[in-house]
Amino acid sequence: QNKYLRKILEMYFVENKEFVDAFKKHSAAKSVHHGFMGGLLEHTLSVTDMCQYFAEHYPMIHRDLLITAALFHDMGKIQEISDFPMNDYTDDGHIYIGARCMENAAAQIPNFPPKLKNELVHCILAHHGKMEFGSPKVPAIMEAMALHMADNADAKLQTLTEVFTQAGDNMGWLGYNRFMESNV
């Protein structure tokens, strides 16, 4: 509903066919979660659904900001992770790339509110939740915290889904999982 955020969404998802094509095909990771073609889109839609839930249940959350941040939170992975069949990490970090893209897009939109731009960029920068997990910022607003929680939940639940699917009928203890930092 917010006209400025709608314009950013249109710039990428309506007007930029190259971005849309890459976004649909890319993985969300090399091997940890959603490490398959289309994984980025699947992960993004799952995170966005969870963020929609948060926005409905916590009225103080700025819904349009949160949904926009959810749709763009991992956009930098298109540049950070090489295309298939390589699907390997490049030197660029997706958090910084995504934040920079949002800043550049906001700068192209006349009268884009500075506070709204800062909040959107903050959500992107803080979506890993902790500095030791790669976030240059920790969540300082409700939208950033909700995005972090949705991103973390989807990544971990998808990881467990993949682990248990590979285990097949062997549903006993499978051993230590590095990403979960626990025996599963």
Language model: regions and residue ranges:
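N-terminal intrinsically disordered, cationic/polar leader segments
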Residues: 148, 170-178
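Terminal helices and disordered tails flanking the catalytic cores of nucleotide-processing hydrolases
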Residues: 178-184
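Generic alpha-helical secondary structure signal
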Residues: 3-7, 17, 114-118, 144, ...
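Alpha-helical protein-protein interaction elements
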Residues: 15, 28, 165-172
